[in-house]
Amino acid sequence: MSQFSFTKMHGLGNSYIYVNMFEEHIPEEELALVAEKVSNRNTGIGADGMILICPSEVAPVKMRMFNNDGSEGKSCGNGLRCVAKYAYEHKLVEETIFTIETLAGIVTAEVTVENDIVTLVKIDMGAPRLTRAELPMLGEGETPFIREDFLFHNQRYAFTAVSMGNPHAVIFVDDVEKAPLTTLGPVLENHEMFPERVNVEFIEILNETEMNFRVWERGSGVTQACGTGACASVVAAILNGKMERGKEITVHLAGGDLMITWTEEGTVMMKGPAEVICHGVYEYKIEA
């Protein structure tokens, strides 16, 4: 029987099991299965996935994120905020502004601290990636993939493709509560045009600075929030002429609000909370 200590945290209800790999060890070949086991809401701790907080050669810490199906993702906005909170509160970093390595690149985090507790985290998510090769998405062309039709159950849905280190297909609808989240979501996620699958967002524009948001996450299904998805959705709204670049946009997710800005300089800034749920020790056994 193997075991490791963990902290369960969430960003707007998007929960992960966080493991401090400065102190714990899980064999590389077991990571995918352990992520699937610990995330199981019936037989494990229950979460949207598992995130490892690891040593890095290029930043104070490195984040590795696994979905609840065991697949590894390249980035996670809500996860980054929680990693930033954990790193500061557990003294893995000393400054309030520091970098985090991800498989999608290095991002900068800034934490707001009150009485040694991180109350708010701002992440510089970098510039959006808009070409097919960067998403990745099948086909050729260097122009952004904006408002292209997709036929589903005899109804056309137009989506815009944006990568924030992981791929997103953003669809604008009149009412997110009536969007085909659990039907169109998995179909588009697994469509052959996306060789690494895709996250699917449904967006309802409320006004110039607010939107409602629902998400079907690649490898996890319906979740309460998706930070990179919120960033991608704001970028898509601006590309479609629905919002203005440089303005702070409030994204209303099922789990709460994020503030997103696509700056004139090109990077996307995400601001929001991160919360600790509990600490514990998880025991598991890998069947031979």
UniProtKB/Swiss-Prot annotation:
InterPro entries: DAP_epimerase_AS, DAP_epimerase_DapF. The active site is at 76 (proton donor), 226 (proton acceptor). Pathway: Amino-acid biosynthesis; L-lysine biosynthesis via DAP pathway; DL-2,6-diaminopimelate from LL-2,6-diaminopimelate: step 1/1. Keywords: Amino-acid biosynthesis, Cytoplasm, Isomerase, Lysine biosynthesis. It catalyses: (2S,6S)-2,6-diaminopimelate = meso-2,6-diaminopimelate. One of its GO terms (cellular component) is cytosol. It is found in: Cytoplasm. It holds the Pfam family DAP_epimerase. Catalyzes the stereoinversion of LL-2,6-diaminopimelate (L,L-DAP) to meso-diaminopimelate (meso-DAP), a precursor of L-lysine and an essential component of the bacterial peptidoglycan. NCBIfam families: DapF. This is Diaminopimelate epimerase. It comes from Bacillus cytotoxicus (strain DSM 22905 / CIP 110041 / 391-98 / NVH 391-98).
